[in-house]
C-alpha cells in the first residue's frame, strides 16, 4: 500500500553467531506509488541496500499474484503457498557457480529489533559447482525472511572470502491502510 515503509539496521555476524550492530548502515524501503505495466498494476518500491554502500537507491516494481510476489517479467521472488518449486535460476556461465531462489525454513521463528515473527524464507542459494567454500561448504544461502502482513523482517548475505554474514534486521515499519 502506498505510504508503507520498512527500516532495517545492519549487523555483522561472525562464524560463532555473535552479532555486532553497525550504526552507519541503515536502510529504508517504502512504497512510493503504483504504475501500470502491460495490463497489470505494480507497486513501486523504492529504497536503499546496505546503507547505499553497494548501489544507489533502487526502484522495484512488484505485485501480488495469488500469494506470490512477482516482477514485471513474471519472476517470483516470494511465495506464500508454493514451498516446492524453484522460482529463479541464475547461471553466470562460468561453470563455477549457479544460483536459485526457493522457499525454505517454512515457519522459522525470527527475532529482530521490532519483534518476533513466524517467517517464510525466500532464500537465494548459490551453489559452488567446482568444490567448497571455506565457510559454507557448497551452498552459500542468502536469507530473505518474510512475516505475514508485515513484509521482509530479516535478510542476510555474505561474501565468499569471508566467514562473516551481514544481516539486515527490521527496526520499524508502517503498513498504510
Q: Residue ranges of each PLM-predicted region?
A:
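Conserved functional acidic sites
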Residues: 1-177
Amino acid at each position: 500500500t502506498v505510504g508503507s515503509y520498512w527500516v532495517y539496521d545492519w549487523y555483522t555476524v561472525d562464524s560463532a553467531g555473535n552479532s555486532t550492530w553497525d550504526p552507519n548502515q541503515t536502510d529504508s524501503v517504502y512504497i512510493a506509488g503504483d504504475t501500470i505495466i502491460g495490463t497489470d498494476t505494480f507497486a513501486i518500491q523504492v529504497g536503499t541496500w546496505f546503507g547505499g554502500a553497494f548501489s544507489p537507491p533502487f526502484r522495484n516494481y512488484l505485485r501480488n499474484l495469488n500469494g506470490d510476489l512477482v516482477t514485471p517479467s513474471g519472476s517470483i521472488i516470494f511465495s506464500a503457498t508454493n514451498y516446492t518449486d524453484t522460482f529463479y535460476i541464475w547461471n553466470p556461465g562460468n561453470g563455477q557457480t549457479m544460483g536459485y531462489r526457493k522457499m525454505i525454513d517454512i515457519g522459522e521463528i525470527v527475532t529482530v529489533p521490532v519483534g518476533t515473527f513466524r517467517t517464510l524464507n525466500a532464500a537465494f542459494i548459490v551453489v559452488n559447482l567446482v568444490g567448497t567454500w571455506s565457510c559454507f561448504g557448497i551452498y552459500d544461502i542468502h536469507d530473505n525472511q518474510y512475516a505475514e502482513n508485515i513484509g521482509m523482517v530479516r535478510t542476510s548475505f555474505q561474501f565468499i572470502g569471508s566467514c562473516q554474514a551481514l544481516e539486515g534486521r527490521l527496526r520499524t515499519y508502517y503498513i498504510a491502510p
